[in-house]
A protein has these predicted regions:
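OB-fold ssDNA-binding interfaces and closely related basic DNA-contact patches used
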Residues: 1-118, 187-188, 192-210
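Extended serine/threonine-enriched, polar tracts that run as long, contiguous segments within proteins
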Residues: 96-210
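Extended, charge-rich, solvent-exposed interface segments
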Residues: 212-214
Protein backbone atom coordinates (compact mmCIF):
# COMPACT_ATOMS: atom_id res chain seq x y z
CA UNK A 1 0.00 0.00 0.00
CA UNK A 2 1.05 3.60 -0.53
CA UNK A 3 1.24 6.00 2.43
CA UNK A 4 0.95 9.68 1.49
CA UNK A 5 2.91 11.06 4.44
CA UNK A 6 1.92 14.19 6.34
CA UNK A 7 3.83 17.48 6.58
CA UNK A 8 2.45 17.92 10.11
CA UNK A 9 4.20 14.72 11.23
CA UNK A 10 7.75 16.01 10.70
CA UNK A 11 8.66 15.47 14.35
CA UNK A 12 7.56 11.83 14.16
CA UNK A 13 9.53 11.25 10.96
CA UNK A 14 9.50 7.97 9.06
CA UNK A 15 6.53 6.91 7.00
CA UNK A 16 4.09 9.15 8.86
CA UNK A 17 6.01 12.19 7.62
CA UNK A 18 7.76 11.23 4.39
CA UNK A 19 5.39 8.67 2.86
CA UNK A 20 6.36 5.45 1.12
CA UNK A 21 5.49 1.79 0.73
CA UNK A 22 3.86 -0.23 3.51
CA UNK A 23 3.42 -3.98 3.75
CA UNK A 24 1.32 -5.65 6.44
CA UNK A 25 3.25 -7.76 8.93
CA UNK A 26 1.47 -10.99 7.96
CA UNK A 27 2.32 -10.66 4.26
CA UNK A 28 5.97 -11.74 4.58
CA UNK A 29 8.45 -12.94 7.18
CA UNK A 30 10.32 -10.32 9.17
CA UNK A 31 13.79 -11.69 8.43
CA UNK A 32 13.34 -11.39 4.66
CA UNK A 33 11.90 -7.89 4.92
CA UNK A 34 14.50 -6.46 7.29
CA UNK A 35 17.33 -8.02 5.27
CA UNK A 36 16.09 -5.99 2.31
CA UNK A 37 15.84 -2.65 4.07
CA UNK A 38 12.25 -2.70 5.29
CA UNK A 39 11.70 -1.12 8.71
CA UNK A 40 9.04 -1.97 11.30
CA UNK A 41 6.27 0.62 11.23
CA UNK A 42 2.73 1.15 12.45
CA UNK A 43 0.11 2.72 10.18
CA UNK A 44 -2.54 4.64 12.10
CA UNK A 45 -5.55 5.33 9.89
CA UNK A 46 -7.90 8.31 10.06
CA UNK A 47 -10.43 6.09 11.81
CA UNK A 48 -7.97 5.53 14.65
CA UNK A 49 -7.41 1.88 13.75
CA UNK A 50 -3.80 0.84 13.28
CA UNK A 51 -1.88 -1.89 11.48
CA UNK A 52 1.54 -3.34 12.21
CA UNK A 53 3.83 -3.79 9.27
CA UNK A 54 6.99 -2.70 7.50
CA UNK A 55 7.93 0.44 5.60
CA UNK A 56 10.36 1.36 2.85
CA UNK A 57 10.53 4.75 1.11
CA UNK A 58 11.49 3.31 -2.29
CA UNK A 59 11.42 -0.10 -3.95
CA UNK A 60 12.23 -1.60 -7.35
CA UNK A 61 9.48 -3.57 -9.04
CA UNK A 62 8.94 -5.70 -12.13
CA UNK A 63 5.48 -4.73 -13.39
CA UNK A 64 3.55 -7.80 -14.56
CA UNK A 65 -0.01 -6.52 -14.97
CA UNK A 66 -2.35 -3.68 -14.00
CA UNK A 67 -6.08 -3.65 -13.31
CA UNK A 68 -8.35 -0.77 -12.32
CA UNK A 69 -11.88 -0.45 -11.01
CA UNK A 70 -14.34 2.03 -9.57
CA UNK A 71 -15.54 1.71 -5.99
CA UNK A 72 -18.53 3.29 -4.28
CA UNK A 73 -18.53 3.29 -0.48
CA UNK A 74 -21.72 2.58 1.44
CA UNK A 75 -22.73 3.37 5.02
CA UNK A 76 -25.04 0.38 5.12
CA UNK A 77 -23.07 -2.39 3.43
CA UNK A 78 -19.95 -3.41 1.53
CA UNK A 79 -18.40 -1.29 -1.18
CA UNK A 80 -19.90 -1.58 -4.64
CA UNK A 81 -17.38 -2.46 -7.35
CA UNK A 82 -17.61 -1.44 -11.01
CA UNK A 83 -15.44 -2.19 -14.07
CA UNK A 84 -13.19 0.67 -15.16
CA UNK A 85 -15.28 1.27 -18.26
CA UNK A 86 -18.48 1.69 -16.21
CA UNK A 87 -17.80 5.06 -14.59
CA UNK A 88 -21.29 6.41 -15.32
CA UNK A 89 -22.87 3.46 -13.52
CA UNK A 90 -20.52 3.90 -10.57
CA UNK A 91 -21.24 7.63 -10.41
CA UNK A 92 -24.97 6.97 -10.45
CA UNK A 93 -24.55 4.67 -7.44
CA UNK A 94 -22.71 7.26 -5.34
CA UNK A 95 -19.31 8.88 -4.97
CA UNK A 96 -17.02 6.86 -7.24
CA UNK A 97 -13.32 6.55 -6.50
CA UNK A 98 -10.76 4.65 -8.55
CA UNK A 99 -8.50 1.92 -7.27
CA UNK A 100 -5.50 0.52 -9.13
CA UNK A 101 -3.90 -2.87 -8.47
CA UNK A 102 -0.42 -3.47 -9.88
CA UNK A 103 0.83 -7.07 -9.93
CA UNK A 104 4.60 -6.99 -9.41
CA UNK A 105 7.69 -8.76 -8.22
CA UNK A 106 9.53 -6.67 -5.64
CA UNK A 107 13.31 -6.72 -5.89
CA UNK A 108 14.76 -8.55 -2.91
CA UNK A 109 11.42 -10.21 -2.15
CA UNK A 110 11.24 -12.44 -5.23
CA UNK A 111 11.13 -15.54 -3.00
CA UNK A 112 7.74 -14.40 -1.70
CA UNK A 113 6.29 -14.43 -5.21
CA UNK A 114 4.13 -11.83 -6.97
CA UNK A 115 2.68 -9.06 -4.82
CA UNK A 116 0.00 -6.44 -5.46
CA UNK A 117 0.58 -2.70 -5.07
CA UNK A 118 -2.67 -0.99 -4.09
CA UNK A 119 -2.99 2.63 -5.22
CA UNK A 120 -5.76 5.21 -5.21
CA UNK A 121 -6.23 8.80 -6.28
CA UNK A 122 -3.10 10.88 -6.69
CA UNK A 123 -0.82 7.92 -5.93
CA UNK A 124 -2.36 5.87 -8.76
CA UNK A 125 -2.11 8.79 -11.18
CA UNK A 126 1.50 9.48 -10.22
CA UNK A 127 2.44 5.82 -10.66
CA UNK A 128 0.70 5.09 -13.95
CA UNK A 129 0.33 8.55 -15.48
CA UNK A 130 -2.70 9.99 -17.21
CA UNK A 131 -3.89 11.90 -20.21
CA UNK A 132 -2.23 15.12 -19.06
CA UNK A 133 0.54 13.90 -16.79
CA UNK A 134 3.48 11.53 -17.03
CA UNK A 135 3.68 8.97 -14.25
CA UNK A 136 6.50 6.70 -13.11
CA UNK A 137 5.42 3.94 -15.51
CA UNK A 138 5.10 6.40 -18.39
CA UNK A 139 8.63 7.70 -17.84
CA UNK A 140 9.90 4.13 -17.52
CA UNK A 141 8.40 3.32 -20.91
CA UNK A 142 9.79 6.48 -22.51
CA UNK A 143 13.33 5.82 -21.28
CA UNK A 144 14.30 2.29 -20.24
CA UNK A 145 11.83 0.39 -22.43
CA UNK A 146 12.37 2.64 -25.45
CA UNK A 147 16.15 2.30 -25.12
CA UNK A 148 15.84 -1.51 -24.91
CA UNK A 149 13.59 -1.61 -27.99
CA UNK A 150 16.06 0.51 -29.96
CA UNK A 151 18.99 -1.65 -28.87
CA UNK A 152 17.14 -4.79 -29.95
CA UNK A 153 16.36 -3.25 -33.34
CA UNK A 154 19.99 -2.25 -33.83
CA UNK A 155 21.21 -5.74 -32.93
CA UNK A 156 18.62 -7.37 -35.21
CA UNK A 157 19.60 -5.17 -38.16
CA UNK A 158 23.26 -5.98 -37.63
CA UNK A 159 22.44 -9.70 -37.63
CA UNK A 160 20.14 -9.41 -40.64
CA UNK A 161 17.11 -10.38 -38.59
CA UNK A 162 13.61 -8.92 -38.28
CA UNK A 163 13.22 -5.81 -36.13
CA UNK A 164 10.29 -4.70 -34.00
CA UNK A 165 10.87 -6.59 -30.75
CA UNK A 166 8.97 -4.87 -27.94
CA UNK A 167 10.17 -5.40 -24.40
CA UNK A 168 7.47 -5.73 -21.71
CA UNK A 169 7.61 -3.67 -18.51
CA UNK A 170 8.34 -6.82 -16.52
CA UNK A 171 11.70 -7.28 -18.26
CA UNK A 172 13.37 -4.55 -16.19
CA UNK A 173 13.27 -3.19 -12.65
CA UNK A 174 11.37 0.06 -12.16
CA UNK A 175 12.67 1.97 -9.10
CA UNK A 176 9.77 3.90 -7.58
CA UNK A 177 9.50 5.70 -4.28
CA UNK A 178 8.46 8.75 -2.31
CA UNK A 179 9.16 12.06 -4.07
CA UNK A 180 12.13 13.99 -2.67
CA UNK A 181 13.52 17.45 -3.38
CA UNK A 182 17.17 18.24 -4.09
CA UNK A 183 17.87 18.39 -0.35
CA UNK A 184 16.46 14.90 0.17
CA UNK A 185 13.38 16.17 2.01
CA UNK A 186 9.86 14.93 1.22
CA UNK A 187 8.32 16.80 -1.71
CA UNK A 188 4.70 17.53 -0.88
CA UNK A 189 2.18 18.44 -3.57
CA UNK A 190 -1.28 19.90 -3.12
CA UNK A 191 -4.23 17.74 -4.15
CA UNK A 192 -7.98 18.01 -3.81
CA UNK A 193 -10.28 21.01 -3.98
CA UNK A 194 -11.56 23.69 -1.61
CA UNK A 195 -11.85 22.38 1.96
CA UNK A 196 -10.71 18.92 0.85
CA UNK A 197 -7.29 20.22 -0.20
CA UNK A 198 -4.31 18.50 1.40
CA UNK A 199 -0.57 18.17 0.88
CA UNK A 200 0.76 14.69 0.14
CA UNK A 201 3.80 12.78 -1.09
CA UNK A 202 3.26 10.66 -4.20
CA UNK A 203 5.31 7.81 -5.75
CA UNK A 204 7.72 8.81 -8.52
CA UNK A 205 10.29 7.03 -10.68
CA UNK A 206 13.71 7.14 -9.02
CA UNK A 207 17.00 7.47 -10.87
CA UNK A 208 15.72 7.13 -14.43
CA UNK A 209 17.51 8.97 -17.26
CA UNK A 210 15.85 12.08 -18.71
CA UNK A 211 15.74 10.57 -22.20
CA UNK A 212 16.09 7.13 -23.78
CA UNK A 213 19.37 8.29 -25.34
CA UNK A 214 20.88 8.71 -21.89
Amino acid sequence: QWHYGDAKAKRAGGMAYAGGWFIKADMADEATLTANGWVKEEWTHDSGASEEGFYKPAIAVSVIAIRKRWEVASDTGPRQLFPWGKYDAAKAAGKASGRTHVLVLVKGLESIGPMVLTLKGSAAMSFEGGRNSAGALTKFGQTVITAANRASDAAAKKAGQATGKKWPYRAFWLPVGAARNSAGEPEFIEVGKDKATKRVVVPVAVGLPDKAEN
